[in-house]
Design a protein with these regions (language model features):
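Flexible "arm" and connector segments at domain edges
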Residues: 1-64, 70-127
């Protein structure tokens, strides 16, 4: 396949799959029903990381990370349909968290070692 899909196009693919005239299986899924899929795909991504270390098979890891992204997108789409939140909210939240927990990069904090970073991370997490 030569076409390169964007994040926006991928988001639309997920919407289409869950649309009334989309895929029956995808339409039936709920947060709860997708738990086994989320767990399986997360484990397969971990396996893909280990395989990359052993064999340098980047294609496998790329595919497995795509499967994890699919899970995130499916849960976000379901949440959007339920009026809870959107993928944009997920991205906003994680972006704010990364900026907040890295004051040594995005603020006035300092960190001279990984240990200092982890200490700051835990302190901020407690707030």
């Amino acid at each position: 396949m030569d076409k390169r899909y964007s994040f926006t196009e991928f988001r639309e693919i997920i919407r289409r799959l869950r649309a009334p005239d989309g895929c029956p299986w995808d339409r039936e899924q709920t947060h709860e029903s997708l738990i086994p899929c989320m767990l399986e795909e997360a484990q397969e991504a971990v396996d893909g990381i280990r395989l990359l270390e052993e064999t340098k098979d980047a294609d496998n890891l790329c595919e497995e990370l795509g499967d994890v992204l699919l899970q995130v997108m499916m849960h976000s789409q379901i949440a959007e349909e339920e009026g809870l939140f959107t993928i944009d909210d997920v991205i906003q939240g994680i972006s704010e968290k990364m900026i907040r927990r890295h004051p040594h990069v995005f603020g006035r904090g300092t960190a001279n070692s990984s240990a200092e970073v982890l200490q700051t991370w835990e302190e901020i997490k407690k707030r």
